[in-house]
Each structure stands twice: as structure tokens, then as C-alpha cells.
A protein has these predicted regions:
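Alpha-helical multipass membrane-protein architecture
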Residues: 1-589
């Protein structure tokens, strides 16, 4: 020990700093569980969430430095890598598996689904590792998300302060969510009190989580907000002015035909018009994003060729290539078993074909998305998932609707999980590159956490569906609904084709503007209940005002940690109440 001028004891370290330690892994697991539950819950509400790495880095400082008094930045980097690997399932699973619940196909084998997602995650990591040196060391792709996390890690004092602010957000959001659940006050009908017409839908969703997500997204969320306002504050008044909205009597008849009770005008507009158009916009925007990413796809292929020529995979900085081969072969075998046994109707040949195609798609998509997110900080994951499941459902179409849906989503979820893990690892490796971490140890940490996310998310989906219902007003699950609508359209052909096509055209047009994901963002505004959009607006305005009045530094150092706490607090309380509802329901019945 040494004594500073202030009289404080300071540890003098000799030898290497701790990095891949049991403490870093266990802390990463705990933080990963917290973040994954929160982000998974947020994803079911908004259709998107936030990268878990920055939250994990902030929380990691609070635990490792603030509580455990450990001072290694690279140990926190490993903890953050492990936590974000667990959180990879929040997008990987939430973008795909909810479609089964929305379609009513809940009798699938959850254990097979978990093993399939784990196999997909392993493949995604193993395929992308050989490209690390090419993409990060040589091409120097920016990976803005990874740079942001490195900035947090390089400011250890600020990291502890941010952790305290985050806990304040957790307590505030958790308290509001608890009161909201106990009192059942989940929406505030402000529009009725100020005389707003019913069709303008002046109802606010009571959710600090939504405000937190919006604050973190900042100006990037404006397009999402614009989509919602275009529906209810522009198009709806125009329809009313032209006398194209149904009368109360007609609305009652429509409600009986749709099987809806208490069908309000805003709900009618959403079900009949805005939601189908929004689904079309999501599909059109996602697929156009793939087309626009073709130059990046070419760069990805060149990166693979360069890596092969220079023997990048054999670098001592990476995991041994033989271990990667073993992992790939083992994961492909598991994926094949999952595909063959996913449903009774599945034959061996068809199942093997699905597994092989899924593996090829994982390899291609993981590289493509890693290139996209490295250059633009945006990846067309939803579009890649839609394409994968479309190919799979065409292969399984002759098995019958139920079998085709379940088997396609099982393999499709594995591909989605792989894409999520590949992009997450590259972001973390960029962070490690900037703080001096050893890539091999980060890669081991990523592998060690791949199993936990799918276990957590599949279980969470069953809990939330039983308590609230996936696809409901409380948990709209936009990405899962889009996937479900697409599968239903392929198998049954009973879809509002013209509305979907109109939306797809609009989404494609918006996506060509050069603003990454614009068609998808505006489409989400069309699709989601306007109450969520209104509340989201508060967070967007707060971020813009904070940047302008207090400065961007204040927003990043104070605002974002509090906003992250708002996400975690409500997410944990929401899941806690879901478990409570199920237990009390069982006891009561």
C-alpha cells in the first residue's frame, strides 16, 4: 500500500492487470440478467431497444469498482462483454420467437428452441472471430457504439458517478411502475380533459421506460415520433374532415365483425388502417435496407478474402482456429438435430437442408451486419430475419401450417440469435481494441455467456405471454407481429394485400433517403399504439432540450445514465408483476 498526499491508501499493482477472472464472469452474468430482462421487455413494447454494452459498463463500474474495490478497466471490459453477450438474446429472440405466441402456436418444444438459439449464437461468434483483425485492426471500421463504451471505460471516476445516477433512475422508474401496476393506472386520457377529438387519440402511456429509451435515442427517434403523429394528428383529421370515418353505430357493427369489445375510434384506425400499413412499411424498409447494403456486402466479401489470404484466423490474439472449427461443427450438428426434431412431420432430409441453409445464412448475415454496424452503427437485422424465415417457410410449406410455422421460427430464431451475437461481439472487440484488452479473452467471455440469454428470454416470453399476452396493447411485440403477418400471408394468403403493398412502397421510398432505417422507424410509428408514441415524444424533447441548454456532455454524463436506470427499473418491475400475476392466478384457480 502507498499513501497519497491526501492521506488515502492506494494499491500499488505489480504484474498484469486482472482481465478474464471468475469475478468478471459472475458479475457479467448478474448484470446480463438485469439488462436482458429490461431490454427484452422494452423490445416487446417498442420493437427496438438499446445496446447493452454501455449499460453494462456503467453498472460494472458500480459493482467492480464501487462495491468490490477492483480497479482494472480491462476486467470491467470482460464483465461488460459477458453481460452484453447475455443481452444479445433480447434482440435475437424478441425479433423472432414472439411470432409463435402471436399466431397461437405455443405448443412448441421450448428446450429445442433454447438449444437452437444457443447453437446459433455459437455459430455467429465462431464465424465472425476470424474477421476481427481485418475489420478492426486493418480496415479500422468505426463501430461508434464500441467507441462510446470505450469512453465510459476510460473514465473510471465518472463511471462510478454514472452508476449512482443509474440507480437513481432505477428507483424512480421502479416506483412509478409499481404504483402504475397496483393502481392499474397505465394510461392517462389527457385528450378527453382538454376536449381533443377521439380520433386524435390523446392518451398517454404511463411509462418511464419509454421516456428512457427515447432520451438515449435522442434525435434518432424523431422519425419514429413523426410516423405516429402523421397517423393520428394528420391523416385521422383529414379522414374526419372528408367524412370517411365510421359513425358510432357503424363502429359497433365493425366491432362485432372483428370480435372486438369497446372498439374506440383510435383502435379502429389502428387495426383497420395504420397497423397494416405500418407492417408493410417495416417489411419494405427492411428489405430495401438489404438492397442498399449491397456495397457493404461486397466489402464484407473482400474482408473475408483478405483474412483468408493473410491467415488472420491463426493470429495468436484470437482463439485457436481448431477450437472454432470444433465449435462450428458441434453447433451445426445441434442445429440439425433441432431442425429435424422440431416437429413430428419433419423428415431427416428436409431438416438437414434447413440446418445447412440456416448455417450458410448465419455465416453471410453475421459478416454483412457486422460490416453495416461498423460503418453506420445501424444494421438491417429485421430484414435479414424476414428473408431467412421466408426461405425456411417456403421449404417447409408442404408440412402443414402449424409444422411449417414452428420449424421455420426455430431455425429462424437461431439465425437471428447468431446475427445479434456477431454484431455484439464486434462492438465489444472494438471497445477492447481501444482499451488494450486481449481479443482472445473477450472471445472466451462471449462464448461463456451465449447460453444464458436464450434460457432467460424463452422463459420470459412464456411468463409475459401468460400474464399480459404478446401482441396485446401492453406488449405489442412489433417485430414478432410483422414476422407473424408475413408467415400467415405466405401460408394462407388472407392478408390486406393492398395496405401491405402501399406500406411496403412507402417504407422502401423512405429508406432510399440515405437516413439509416428511416422506413422502419416511421413504420414503427404507424404500427405502435399512439399512446406509446406520445410518451416517447417526452424523452425525445428532453434529450434535444438537454443537448441545447446544458450541452451534449451533460446529456451523456448525467442524462443517459439516468435514462438507462429508467429502462431497468420498469423492466424489472414489469417482469416481477408478470410472475406475481401468474402465481396468484395459479393459486386462485
Amino acid at each position: 500500500m502507498a499513501e497519497t498526499e491526501a492521506g488515502e491508501n492506494r494499491i500499488i499493482r505489480r504484474g498484469p492487470y486482472p482481465e478474464l477472472t471468475l469475478t468478471s464472469i459472475l458479475v457479467g452474468y448478474v448484470l446480463g440478467v438485469l439488462i436482458t430482462i429490461s431490454m427484452g421487455y422494452a423490445c416487446l413494447i417498442l420493437g427496438f431497444s438499446h445496446e447493452g454494452s454501455e449499460l453494462a459498463a456503467i453498472l460494472g463500474f458500480g459493482v467492480l469498482r464501487g462495491i468490490l474495490r477492483r480497479n482494472s478497466i480491462i476486467e470491467n471490459n470482460i464483465s461488460q462483454t459477458v453481460a452484453s453477450s447475455v443481452n444479445g438474446a433480447s434482440a435475437g429472440v424478441m425479433f423472432s420467437v414472439p411470432a409463435l405466441f402471436i399466431l397461437g402456436e405455443t405448443d412448441f418444444n421450448p428446450y429445442l428452441m433454447v438449444f437452437g438459439c444457443i447453437a446459433g449464437g455459437i455459430l455467429g461468434i465462431a464465424f465472425i472471430i476470424p474477421l476481427r483483425k481485418q475489420m478492426i485492426d486493418f480496415e479500422r471500421l468505426t463501430y461508434p457504439g464500441g467507441v462510446a463504451v470505450a469512453t465510459v471505460l476510460k473514465s473510471p471516476g465518472a463511471g462510478v458517478h454514472k452508476a449512482i445516477l443509474l440507480m437513481i433512475g432505477v428507483i424512480l422508474s421502479g416506483t412509478v411502475a409499481f404504483i402504475s401496476n397496483v393502481t392499474k393506472f397505465e394510461n392517462w386520457a389527457l385528450g378527453q380533459h382538454i376536449g381533443m377529438p377521439d380520433y386524435m387519440n390523446g392518451i398517454w402511456f404511463v411509462s418511464l421506460l419509454t421516456i428512457g429509451i427515447a432520451f438515449i435515442a435522442g434525435k434518432g427517434g424523431l422519425c419514429f415520433v413523426i410516423g405516429g403523429y402523421a397517423c393520428y394528428w394528420v391523416l385521422a383529421p383529414i379522414l374526419a374532415r372528408m367524412n370517411l370515418l365510421p359513425s358510432p353505430e357503424q363502429l359497433q357493427v365493425i366491432a362485432e365483425r372483428l370480435g372486438e369489445q369497446n372498439l374506440s375510434m383510435p383502435k379502429y384506425l389502428r387495426i383497420v388502417l395504420f397497423r397494416p400499413v405500418g407492417i408493410g412499411m417495416l417489411v419494405g424498409g427492411a428489405l430495401t435496407g438489404i438492397v442498399l447494403a449491397l456495397p457493404l456486402i461486397v466489402n464484407s466479401i473482400r474482408s473475408m478474402q483478405s483474412a483468408a489470404k493473410t491467415g488472420m484466423a491463426l493470429s495468436k490474439d484470437e482463439m485457436p482456429i481448431k477450437l472454432l472449427y470444433i465449435g462450428i461443427i458441434g453447433a451445426v450438428i445441434v442445429l440439425g438435430i433441432v431442425a429435424v426434431t422440431s416437429v413430428e412431420e419433419m423428415g431427416i432430409v428436409r431438416g438437414i437442408v434447413m440446418a445447412v441453409l440456416g448455417t450458410i445464412w448465419i455465416w453471410m448475415a453475421g459478416v454483412i451486419l457486422s460490416e453495416c454496424i461498423g460503418r453506420t452503427n445501424w444494421s438491417p437485422m429485421s430484414g435479414m430475419t424476414l428473408i431467412a424465415v421466408t426461405i425456411l417457410i417456403v421449404i417447409t410449406r408442404g408440412l402443414g401450417d402449424r409444422a411449417a410455422i414452428i420449424s421455420s421460427v426455430m431455425v429462424g430464431a437461431a439465425t437471428c440469435m447468431a446475427m445479434s451475437q456477431a454484431t455484439d461481439l464486434m462492438l465489444d472487440l472494438k471497445t477492447g481494441y481501444l482499451v488494450g484488452a486481449i481479443p482472445r479473452k473477450q472471445q472466451i467471455g462471449q462464448f461463456l455467456a451465449t447460453w444464458l440469454g436464450p434460457v432467460l428470454m424463452i422463459g420470459l416470453l412464456f411468463v409475459l405471454h401468460k400474464a399480459y399476452g404478446l401482441g396485446s396493447e401492453k406488449l405489442p411485440a412489433p417485430q414478432g407481429t410483422v414476422l407473424a403477418s408475413m408467415m400467415r400471408g405466405i401460408l394462407e394468403g388472407n392478408v390486406p394485400v393492398y395496405k401491405y403493398l402501399a406500406g411496403a412502397g412507402l417504407g422502401a421510398l423512405l429508406s432510399t433517403t440515405g437516413i439509416g432505417g428511416l422506413g422502419i422507424q416511421v413504420g414503427l410509428g404507424f404500427y405502435l399504439p399512439f399512446s406509446i408514441v406520445l410518451t416517447y415524444t417526452i424523452g425525445t424533447i428532453l434529450r434535444i432540450a438537454s443537448d441545447k441548454i446544458k450541452g451534449q456532455h451533460f446529456s451523456e454524463q448525467v442524462g443517459i445514465p439516468i435514462a438507462a436506470g429508467l429502462i431497468i427499473g420498469e423492466g424489472i418491475v414489469g417482469v416481477g408483476f408478470a410472475i406475481y400475476y401468474i402465481i396468484t392466478g395459479m393459486q386462485g384457480g
